[in-house]
From Swiss-Prot:
<feature type="compositionally biased region" description="Low complexity">
    <location>
        <begin position="302"/>
        <end position="320"/>
    </location>
</feature>
<dbReference type="GO" id="GO:0051295">
    <property type="term" value="P:establishment of meiotic spindle localization"/>
</dbReference>
<keyword id="KW-0813">Transport</keyword>
<keyword id="KW-0653">Protein transport</keyword>
<dbReference type="InterPro" id="IPR011019">
    <property type="entry name" value="KIND_dom"/>
</dbReference>
<dbReference type="GO" id="GO:0030041">
    <property type="term" value="P:actin filament polymerization"/>
</dbReference>
<feature type="region of interest" description="Disordered">
    <location>
        <begin position="224"/>
        <end position="366"/>
    </location>
</feature>
<feature type="modified residue" description="Phosphoserine">
    <location>
        <position position="510"/>
    </location>
</feature>
<feature type="domain" description="WH2 1">
    <location>
        <begin position="147"/>
        <end position="165"/>
    </location>
</feature>
<feature type="domain" description="KIND">
    <location>
        <begin position="1"/>
        <end position="73"/>
    </location>
</feature>
<dbReference type="GO" id="GO:0016192">
    <property type="term" value="P:vesicle-mediated transport"/>
</dbReference>
<dbReference type="GO" id="GO:0070649">
    <property type="term" value="P:formin-nucleated actin cable assembly"/>
</dbReference>
<comment type="subunit">
    <text>Interacts with FMN2.</text>
</comment>
<protein>
    <recommendedName>
        <fullName>Protein spire homolog 1</fullName>
    </recommendedName>
</protein>
<feature type="region of interest" description="Disordered">
    <location>
        <begin position="1"/>
        <end position="30"/>
    </location>
</feature>
<feature type="modified residue" description="Phosphoserine">
    <location>
        <position position="292"/>
    </location>
</feature>
<keyword id="KW-0677">Repeat</keyword>
């Protein structure tokens, strides 16, 4: 507590005064009883202060503070009183419903003015002062502070002197160090810790690999492939054999004189049994494998057929060759499916049609197994025709490849790519007034002259055969087939073959005139197809039909020649041959 030694020897207000107890109280009672005038009161009040000269200023400040507090209390009570009166008036207004007259009186009232100010402040927003903007005066003016505030100000500014406190007749020692330093000393007094380098930690357990890391390792690891010799690869590519190819090999071996008649008979019987025994499913090869196998087959046929002269046939267009390369993804046994033409029909046709009576005489009566395979081969399953979806995919790939040819001509390439130029004629440009037609097959814009109408189903395309779209294309294929027949007639020296040609023609017509049922074509609608796509479809249909017809002809021809040179049955061994109704 702030305490200074008084000059007049008056009692102190500190702890010693509290310890003196009843003696001080008795002295105060005597002094109070001795007060008889205002001067005695002033002297008594001045004795409470450390210096008597500050008494007038101090008590004037106290009086001012008390007066200010009383005035504030008076104004507050007046406002409360006026607010109560106004509230009573409002209640009376609600009762009397005379709001129009009372509102004019309330305009001049204080509470209405204050309410307007409050609403204005709420609308505009009240700006609060920051703490830094407040200027705190450490030495305020005396008359602005109350005695309690003045005392707290003295304590904050440390304007006081403390008494010496004695403990057991001696001054207690001060704390030499702070609590933080004591804690640090305690930590240092403990035994030292081992350095990190000297510690031996346990090995970290292996972290399990995540799924992403395992997938990446499998991708980076090389696949272990089974070693395959090149002979097996060649054998798997060139393993597709027909009875005609085995017969050609037998004929070439007979011309060279390397085999006897006994080995020839055994070879023929084994060659005829191969189609019946080897019945496995073939997967559709990719375009790269087809190209590689085609190049190998062409080199092989060039080496084997060096002595024979192939007849002259007109070359088929490029689109037909590409379309015939792509096989349908349907799996058929080799014995029951004739292989489609792949730039080899002239050689096959030549090998069949160039037969001589000397070669035919070497045939032996076929066994039951070989005759059954011949019957299956004579009437193969009509699976050579591609589906509509496959043809659409082939056509779109060809159109995309055809578009890449025009990359060197930037104007034409950009016009074709953006659909501003006809894709067929490449002369007609499209504008705002001349619209384009979109081909439903190749999905390319074409002009009205290059657009044709064609009946197409809505969907699905995956199971629908391609020959169902265009019977007219089939008729064109038949006419082209008939035009090719006279050119190959002089290659058939056998009269027996010519004798059975009339029957085969009638049967071929019945096979070729197969059309899609009209009941299933009722819901088909006419759609726009470009000229190139229509020609492409007709060529695919004609080529597939042509290969099917040729396969049927070869099978029937071989069966007829074998039955012709077989020994005639006796009267007891007579057995009627099994023939279909169409043959009869």
């Amino acid at each position: 507590m702030a305490n200074t030694v008084e000059a007049d020897g008056s009692n102190d207000e500190g702890y010693e005064a509290a310890e003196e107890g009843p003696e001080d109280e008795e002295d105060e009672k005597r002094e109070i009883s001795a007060i008889r005038s205002y001067r005695d009161v002033m002297k008594l009040c001045a004795a409470h202060l450390p210096t008597e000269s500050d008494a007038p200023n101090h008590y004037q400040a106290v009086c001012r503070a008390l007066f200010a507090e009383t005035m504030e209390l008076h104004t507050f009570l007046a406002k409360v009183k006026s607010a109560k009166e106004n509230l009573k008036k409002i209640q009376e207004m609600e009762k009397s419903d005379e709001s129009s007259t009372d509102l004019e009186e309330l305009k001049n009232a204080d509470w209405a003015r204050f309410w307007v100010q409050v609403m204005r402040d709420l609308r505009n927003g009240v700006k609060l002062k920051k703490v830094q903007e407040r200027q705190y005066n450490p030495l305020p003016i005396e008359y602005q502070l109350t005695p309690y505030e003045m005392l707290m100000d003295d304590i904050r500014c440390k304007r006081y002197t403390l008494r010496k406190v004695m403990v057991n007749g001696d001054i207690p020692p001060r704390l030499k160090k702070s609590a933080h330093e004591i804690i640090l000393d305690f930590i240092r007094s403990r035994p030292p810790l081992n350095p990190v380098s000297a510690r031996k930690l346990k090995p970290t357990p292996p972290r399990p690999r995540s799924l992403h890391e395992r997938i990446l390792e499998e991708i980076k690891a090389e696949r272990k492939l089974r070693p395959v010799s090149p002979e097996e690869i060649r054998r798997s590519r060139l393993d597709v054999t027909t009875p005609e190819s085995t017969k050609n090999l037998m004929e070439s071996s007979m011309v060279n004189g390397g085999l006897t008649s006994q080995t020839k008979e055994n070879g023929l019987s084994s060659a005829e049994q191969v189609p019946a025994q080897r019945k496995k499913l073939l997967k559709a090869p990719t375009l790269a494998e087809l190209d590689s196998s085609e190049s190998e087959e062409e080199t092989l046929h060039k080496s084997t057929s060096s002595s024979s002269v192939s007849p002259s046939f007109p070359e088929e267009p490029v689109l037909e060759a590409v379309s015939t390369r792509k096989k349908p993804p349907k799996f058929l046994p080799i014995s029951s499916t004739p292989q489609p033409e792949r730039r080899q029909p002239p050689q096959r046709r030549h090998s069949i049609e160039k037969e001589t009576p000397t070669n035919v005489r070497q045939f032996l009566p076929p066994s039951r197994q070989s005759s059954r395979s011949l019957e299956e081969f004579c009437y193969p399953v009509e699976c050579l025709a591609l589906t509509v979806e496959e043809v659409m995919h082939i056509r779109q790939v060809l159109v995309k490849a055809e578009l890449e040819k025009y990359q060197q001509y930037k104007d034409i390439y950009t016009a074709l790519k953006k659909g501003k130029l006809c894709f067929c004629c490449r002369t007609r440009r499209f504008s705002f007034f001349t619209w384009s037609y979109t081909c439903q097959f190749c999905k390319r814009p074409v002009c009205s002259q290059c657009c044709k109408k064609m009946r197409l189903p809505s969907k699905p395309y995956s199971t629908l055969p391609i020959f169902s779209l265009g019977p007219s294309a089939l008729q064109r294929g038949e006419s082209s087939m008939r035009s090719e027949k006279p050119s190959t007639a002089h290659h058939r020296p056998l009269r027996s073959i010519a004798r059975f040609s009339s029957k085969s023609k009638s049967m071929d017509k019945s096979d070729e005139e197969l059309q899609f049922p009209k009941e299933l074509m009722e819901d088909w609608s006419t759609m726009e197809v470009c000229v190139d796509c229509k020609k492409f479809i007709s060529e695919i249909i004609s080529s597939s039909r042509r290969s099917l017809v040729l396969a049927n002809k070869r099978a029937r021809l071989k069966r007829k020649t074998q039955s012709f040179y077989m020994s005639p049955p006796g009267p007891s061994e007579y057995c009627p041959s099994e023939r279909t109704i169409s043959e009869i």
